[in-house]
A protein has these predicted regions:
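Terminal domain-start segments
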Residues: 17-60
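Blade-terminus and WD-like Trp-Asp/Gly-His loop motifs, strongest in beta-propeller folds
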Residues: 27-35, 67-74, 131-140
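Short coil/turn segments at the loop-to-beta-strand junctions that recur within blades
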Residues: 61-66, 113-116
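Beta-propeller blade signature
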Residues: 92-103
Length: 164
């Protein structure tokens, strides 16, 4: 009987632990050349640094699961915390990408801006897959691949799509 109780308690503890959200990890992302880096820490917030001198260039509020920094050290893009998965009850107002310049957000790209037709979305078991953010290239363009396979390049200095 004692063994049965021990097994039951062990299983219930492991089930409870498995259903808990993941802890917020610290996140470090280098620019294409490695000159600058973005650091997002759950306790200290997010900041952009000169990688050689370890000098903070600017900061932004909060923690961000996914962020991309340009070589100029002035521009950064944050991605929706759900990454490439959207809830099935999504709102067209949900922000997929936020463009920042030296600590100030200057443009949001929302679901309605990037996914004009929800038919583009791919259904998973519990969510919708909307696309993949590949990162910022040496020319300061954020490459985003939508779920339908169409590629977009966003000029990070203006937060709008540009020609390849």
């Amino acid at each position: 009987m004692r063994a049965l109780v021990t097994v039951a308690i062990t299983i219930s503890v492991n089930v409870a632990r498995a259903d808990m959200p993941l802890p917020l990890p610290a996140n470090v992302r280098a620019s294409p050349s490695g000159r600058t880096r973005a650091i997002s820490d759950p306790k200290a917030g997010a900041r952009v640094e000169d990688a050689k001198r370890h000098k903070v260039l600017w900061s932004l509020p909060g923690w961000h699961r996914s962020l991309f920094v340009a070589d100029d050290g002035k521009h950064l893009v944050t991605q929706y915390d759900g990454l490439n998965l959207l809830p099935t009850h999504l709102s067209d107002d949900l922000v997929l990408l936020a463009f920042w310049r030296e600590g100030r957000k200057f443009r949001d790209v929302r679901v309605r801006d990037f996914l004009p037709d929800h038919q583009i979305l791919e259904r998973t078991v519990t969510h919708y897959h909307w696309g993949i953010v590949h990162g910022i290239d040496a020319q300061g363009r954020l490459k985003v691949e939508r779920a339908d396979g169409k590629n977009f390049l966003f000029d990070v200095s203006i937060g709008k799509t540009t020609e390849a």
